[in-house]
Amino acid sequence: MEQFLAVGKIINTHGIKGEIKVMPSTDNVERFKELNEAYIDGNIVEIEGCKFQPGKVILKIKGIDSIEDAQRLKNKYIKVSRENAATLDEDCYYEADIVGCTVYDENEKQLGNIDEIIHTGSNDVYWIKGPNELLIPAIKSVIVDIDVNNKKIIIKPLEVWQ
């Protein structure tokens, strides 16, 4: 399993004092308030400040004090170590643990691997790449079992729900 988990992607600078604008990839943006340290490119960084905009988080990182410094971080990911990650509810998983899983139907037919998770308004959708590309809704009526330790997901046969 991944040692570090992405909690957001740096999408732009904010202001002229080195703040960065982050698109959160966590469903609980309030966790950023308690974030004292994170990782960017495997290097630990100290978080000095946090504020919110609709759908975005603005962070101030120690040592990043100019717009030029902040610009160099654009398109990088803010990550936390797994042991410092938020505790998940039952039947909830980190994206890093889902992406790469092999998907099978209940008849043990291999359908492909999860390449990406698409966030929609109502539920996530797993983008499966294999012999055919598939979009699988991440809902209980379709997903039978998720085993992140063995990187295996079982779904109902396509003809049942498609």
Curated annotation (Swiss-Prot):
Keywords: Chaperone, Cytoplasm, Ribosome biogenesis, rRNA processing. Coiled coil: none annotated. Its main location: cytoplasm. GO terms for molecular function: ribosome binding. GO terms for cellular component: cytoplasm; ribosome. Residues 90-161 form the PRC barrel domain. GO terms for biological process: ribosomal small subunit biogenesis; rRNA processing. It is found in: Cytoplasm. Gene3D superfamilies: PRC-barrel domain, RimM. HAMAP family: Ribosome_mat_RimM. Binds ribosomal protein uS19. Belongs to the RimM family. An accessory protein needed during the final step in the assembly of 30S ribosomal subunit, possibly for assembly of the head region. Essential for efficient processing of 16S rRNA. May be needed both before and after RbfA during the maturation of 16S rRNA. It has affinity for free ribosomal 30S subunits but not for 70S ribosomes. This is Ribosome maturation factor RimM. The gene is rimM.
